[in-house]
Amino acid sequence: MSRLRIRYGAVASSLAVLLAGCVHGNPTTRVAVDRGYESVYLALLKDARRCYPATAGTAQREVNGTLDGPGRAGKITFSLRSPTAQETFMNVDIRGTESTRSQVDIQVAPGWEAHAQAVRGWLEGTSSACV
């Protein structure tokens, strides 16, 4: 049984290492939203936590968010955590461009594009589906 756990841990750790640095080098999907940045941030964070609930286990998905009131911005990171590493597979940056308008940039690691499409669906109100 412990060998099986070690193998799963090694696989999760290897996957996390492969994801390292992949997010930042990829093209950004930009979405304009007719809502204020804080409203967009809170709605996205709620959907993200619904679709990526905190779990226990060898390979976990994790969602973290930060809101910067003075900077009129927010950031949500989607990560894969293993016992030995944590690597981000998607970043969502939200910036208020006007009082009721926001710009959202989505960067995703290769192989995780369906997750970015899900986020876009949440933003545009065309889908509430989880991947």
Task: Kindly give the residue locations of the regions a language model identified.
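Ser/Thr-rich, low-complexity intrinsically disordered terminal regions
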Residues: H24-V131
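C-terminal motif of bacterial Sec signal peptides marking the signal peptidase cleavage site
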Residues: L18-G21
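Bacterial N-terminal signal peptides that target proteins for export
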Residues: M1-A12
